[in-house]
Each structure stands twice: as structure tokens, then as C-alpha cells.
Amino acid sequence: MIIHPNFDPVAIHLGPLAVRWYGLMYLVGFILAIVVGRLRLKLPHVAAQGWSAKDIDDMMFYGVLGVVLGGRLGYVLFYKAGYYFSHPLDIFRVWEGGMSFHGGFLGVTLAMALFAWQRKRHWLEVTDFVAPMVPTGLAAGRLGNFINGELWGRVTSPDAPWAMLFPGASRDDAAWLAAHQDIAAKWNLNEVFLSHQMLPRHPSQLYEIALEGIALFFVLWFFSRKPRPMGAISALFLIGYGAARFTVEFAREPDDFLGLLTFGLSMGQWLSLPMIVAGVLMMIWAYRRGGVAKQA
């Protein structure tokens, strides 16, 4: 078993200002997205569409607004609506955590629609350009989750070489142990808990980095290196992210205030299913429609 390093959540102290790892990872994610976007400008079929470095910079402004506003509102509405309706001022306490990818996705989608309208481009032309830029940002965000020791995975066997002990999960571990003595006996978890006051869990944040970040990036990068029908790259992102998130959720601990929902699926899985369906339908539409994005 591996013990999580339990990093200090504050990366840098600048006088009275504390720069947290999670916020720093958001910054890294946006920088990586810009780098990927500029690399895409070197592709002949992308350059022929008239994209420029200034377009990328402007996109990032819209993207940051979409991620922050959409991510926060998505968390409020999808995960803890009852609490925030009773404590509306807490919605603005973003530094305490609480962001939703699916909310951020909707926020960025709306932001890119506004960008497309202002630039007189088709909305899907914009999202096709942006889609390969997203996974590196997702990977950075999940790395922030891992550094913070949050959003850990479900309990697993201590014999698994990747099993990890998360100090922040100790309270949840005690409750889990009391409710699952059958599994605890099978995996000798009572002995593990007595020794460490923690239970071995999946490092699901690392799984998400591997699937939603690295794997999805390479899939989208190589797929988008050739001209594709408008909407196809966006569709592949929807399918790829939805499938990756749906899969990882089987190893990720459900939110304690929600638990598992209908059919034993988590909220993250239920929110990912529409993405997969929409992606498949969009891919079919894109290839039936044919053609590629117009050239400048």
C-alpha cells in the first residue's frame, strides 16, 4: 500500500497571500490549453480556417469565465442544491472548493457559442478547434485534486499494488468499515484500519488523469490532425470524456451527500450518459452531413 503524501494545500506564500495548489493547477491547465491551441495552428487545414494566436487568447478569456461560472453553478445545482438554496451567500465561497466538470462543460459551451457569434463562425467550428485543448486542462485539475488528497476512490483490497491510504478519508473509512464488515473480513481490512486508521482506496484522481487527460488528449490530437466533418471532433470529445468518466466513477467514491442513485450509478455517471448519447448522435450527423469547416 502507498500512503498519500498529504501535501500542504498551499503551494506558495506571498506575504498575506496564499496560492493554493488547486488554483495553481487551474492556471497550469489554461496555459497548457494555450500551448496545445498554438500547436494546432501549425496544422495546414487548421491554418486554412483562418485561426490565429489572438483567437486563442480571446477564446481563453471566454473559457475561463465559462469554467469558473459554469463549474461553480453546476456544483451548486447538480450536487448540493438544497444546501445552497438555504445558504445562498456560500455560493460565492469558491475558495472552499466545489466545482463540477459537467457544469464547467456547459459554461464553456455557452461561452464558445458567444465567441462564435461575435466572430461570425459556426459554433461547432469553434468547439472542434477547442476540443483537443481541453484534456490537458482536465489532467491538471485532477492533479490538483490528488495533491489536495480529495475526491479519492472507493475502498479496495490492500493487496492491490496501487492501493493508497488517504489521511483525509479517515472519517469516511471508519463509517465504511462499520457498514461493510463482510468485505472487511474478506480483505482483512479491520487489521489494516487498526494499524493505519485508514483504509486502502483507489487513487481515482490518477485514473482520471490517465483516461480523461492523457488518453483523451492523444485520441483527439491524432483524430484532429486530418480534416474532419464539422462537429466530428466535438462529438469524439463528448464520447471520449463521457466514457472515461463513466468508467472511472466505478472506482471513485460517490459524494457522501448523494451516494449512489438509480441503478447504483453515481451522479457523475448519470451526467456522463447524455454526453455519450449526444456525442454518438453528433458523430452520425457530422459524417452524414459531410464536408469540413469552411476555409478563411
Curated annotation (Swiss-Prot):
Q: Name one GO biological process term.
A: lipoprotein biosynthetic process
Q: What does the entry list as the binding residues for a 1,2-diacyl-sn-glycero-3-phospho-(1'-sn-glycerol)?
A: 142
Q: What is the protein's membrane topology class?
A: Multi-pass membrane protein
Which GO CC annotations does the UniProt entry carry?
A: plasma membrane
Q: Which InterPro entries match?
A: Lgt
- Keyword terms of this UniProt record: Cell inner membrane, Cell membrane, Membrane, Transferase, Transmembrane, Transmembrane helix
Q: Name one Pfam family in it.
A: LGT
Q: What is its EC number?
A: 2.5.1.145
Tell where it localizes: Cell inner membrane
Look up the record and name the pathway of this protein.
Protein modification; lipoprotein biosynthesis (diacylglyceryl transfer)
Q: What is its main location?
A: membrane
Question: Which top class of enzyme applies to this chain?
Answer: transferase
Question: Which Gene Ontology terms cover its molecular function?
Answer: phosphatidylglycerol-prolipoprotein diacylglyceryl transferase activity
> Which residue ranges run through the membrane?
17-37, 59-79, 97-117, 230-250, 265-285
The family line of this record is: Belongs to the Lgt family.
**HAMAP family noted in UniProt:** Lgt (MF_01147)
- Described function: Catalyzes the transfer of the diacylglyceryl group from phosphatidylglycerol to the sulfhydryl group of the N-terminal cysteine of a prolipoprotein, the first step in the formation of mature lipoproteins.
Protein name as catalogued: Phosphatidylglycerol--prolipoprotein diacylglyceryl transferase
Where is the organism placed in the taxonomic lineage, from the top? Bacteria, Pseudomonadati, Pseudomonadota, Betaproteobacteria, Burkholderiales
- Encoding gene, per UniProt annotation: lgt
